[in-house]
A protein has these predicted regions:
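Catalytic cores of nucleic-acid endonucleases
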Residues: 96-158
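Acidic-basic catalytic patches of nuclease active cores, encompassing PD-(D/E)XK
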Residues: 1-70
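Beta-rich catalytic cores
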Residues: 75
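Polybasic (Lys/Arg-rich)
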Residues: 161-183
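Conserved catalytic cores of phosphodiester-cleaving nucleases, focusing on short active-site segments
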Residues: 79-81, 87-95, 112
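Polar/charged alpha-helical tracts
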Residues: 6-13, 122-125, 162, 180
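Short, charge-rich binding segments
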Residues: 70-72, 80-84, 137-141
Length: 183
């Protein structure tokens, strides 16, 4: 079983313990689909956790049992996955101009960390742990193992698309200025 499968098992146990059973596993193609433009920003069948489904259908109701509106949900990235080297990826898909998304992207980054830590520690209290996670130093674990990826539509963000292209030519990663606060 992969590390991602182990993590998904823990997430499903968490939901089950609270009386929820939703399919939170998806793929990049479905998770990156924009209903507005009717396209997927990523054409891949890589398995991911659909963070929006988890946040809106289960986590919101667990932490806010009286909530009747999905608007009460925490803001999360769209997708989450773990590779074989135990690097965690939160992926945000933006089919909009980035100037409209800067604050939301940063809030989502912190909300993701909070929600995942909340689940990990809640399950630890039930003697169910995700062994690769460092429960003794979670902040260091997140700094070392978590990567936040922002996928955007180049046509709507020509400046960022050009910067990305220039950085690729130099074999460098492109990090928009507003995301440097996440380093």
């Amino acid at each position: 079983m992969s590390k991602f499968d182990d993590f998904m098992k823990l997430m499903n146990q968490y939901m089950s313990y609270h009386g929820f059973s939703f399919e939170i596993c998806s793929d990049m193609r479905l998770t990156s689909y924009s209903g507005e433009s009717k396209v997927s920003l990523v054409d891949s069948d890589v398995r991911v956790m659909d963070m929006d489904v988890f946040a809106k259908k289960a986590y919101r109701k667990i932490i806010l049992p009286d909530s009747l509106s999905e608007a009460d949900s925490i803001n999360t990235a769209d997708a989450f996955l773990i590779n074989k080297c135990d690097e965690w990826y939160f992926v945000e898909f933006k089919d909009a101009k980035m100037s409209n998304a800067k604050t939301g992207v940063l809030k989502k980054a912190y909300s993701n960390v909070y929600a995942v830590m909340d689940v990990l520690y809640a399950m630890k209290e039930k003697n169910i742990e995700y062994p690769p996670f460092d429960y003794g130093n979670p902040i260091q674990f997140f700094r070392t193992h978590v990567i936040y990826i922002l996928v955007f539509r180049g046509a709507l963000n020509p400046h960022h698309a050009m910067q990305l292209k220039n950085h690729r030519l130099k074999h460098e990663h492109y990090l928009p200025e507003f995301m440097k606060r996440l380093e």
